[in-house]
């Protein structure tokens, strides 16, 4: 999958116009999920909340293969998830396996430093990320 810098609202607009897509919000919580998605997954058990809203939900486990078929989803969304994943490269491989394309939203060290006043890992963050615009690569 190619990596490009984009904006959350651009992606939400695209998804709202393409309702036929099978969209997974991976790492969502019930209080903060993308309304454009039609399948949801997280390590916490939100099944009851999502099922009451007639939304498809799958509980996943850390450091385990994701319980989805190869290329099952047209689009996979990760909003502030990658920085928490202990096995980053294996997790990336799983994302490529289950999704045809997607959107990954990441915090930056600068943002976390300004907002939280520290450049130490916080809120369970295991990684810092930086996008190299010239070479179109994500550094960690």
Residue ranges and their predicted role:
Residues 11-17, 25, 41, 70, ...:
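Non-transmembrane, interaction-prone segments in cytosolic or luminal domains
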Residues 1-69, 75:
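Conserved N-terminal segment of class I S-adenosyl-L-methionine
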């Amino acid at each position: 999958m190619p990596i490009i810098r984009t904006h959350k609202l651009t992606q939400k607009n695209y998804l709202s116009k393409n309702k036929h897509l099978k969209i997974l919000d991976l790492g969502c919580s019930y209080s903060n999920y993308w309304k454009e998605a039609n399948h949801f997954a997280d390590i916490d058990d939100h099944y009851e909340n999502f099922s009451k809203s007639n939304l498809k939900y799958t509980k996943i486990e850390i450091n385990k293969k994701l319980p989805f078929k190869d290329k099952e989803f047209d689009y996979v969304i990760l909003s502030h998830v990658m920085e928490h994943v202990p096995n980053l490269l294996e997790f990336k491989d799983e994302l490529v396996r289950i999704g045809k394309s997607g959107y990954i939203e990441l915090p930056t060290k600068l943002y976390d430093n300004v907002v939280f006043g520290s450049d130490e890992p916080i809120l369970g963050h295991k990684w810092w990320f930086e996008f190299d615009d010239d070479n179109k690569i994500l550094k960690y």
